[in-house]
């Protein structure tokens, strides 16, 4: 039964295109619409800019680009985006949202696992990755590779957008009720606070060697964001193993791929998102890619609960991360209706039933 409020499912996203509410420079890719989101595609040009910026009320992104751009890069045949630089790319998709519909954006999971910092910008924006109700205009993506230089091209998909009507967030009591019926995390006593389920870090390791994660290497070759299984793991990553202490010292400005201790489940009538980490709890950032689609870890779509892969970066000081330490919270929202496709069932999902897993670009 459909709801009046909630996150739009795949069929409703397709209807936005049919109704002219979602516009694109070209036909959609076959797998571009996901169960609860739409992948956004890069346009044909990238603007290298001096610094990131917020347009602010009354200002267009294009006007800011005229003042801040250093040079323009043609993406039609592919181009390298260097680490430490900031780029603004007009996206192929634009919006003409109904008055009651808003949207939010997030990096795709493979983007976060490459440590590519991205956020969507709109004209007159006062927040990144937030599209106000009734917005009409273009979309832009800010891109800043942090660890690896990357090759992108027109049509590359680094970010995704979710559409919602009204308030869809589950309350703390609703999350607990849902956990009792659908087991959201593999725990008899989930830590639920502020409507979010706590996720903690696993530093005991997996397999005979006790692998706990990976640390990104510096001064590597480029990663082509559109090529799967194209790169060797050890050319880009240093494996990290448990040494018995069940802790890991995060070095400043290093990038880590780790995994949650809990297995996560998102039932088909709900979507989830990893909330930004509370800086009062620790001096590090966890998880660029926050969207979890309906069906993530769901038994009917090939999962038995999937652990959340975490992108972790320390800030100004070294920080000791300990096994079982809470590193983020997963909040749940209602879908307006059940998606036709679920995560893991033929919708381009690369990480169903995952444990510790690097992005799809790496072999092994």
List where the protein language model places each region.
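DUTPase catalytic domain/fold
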Residues: 1-364
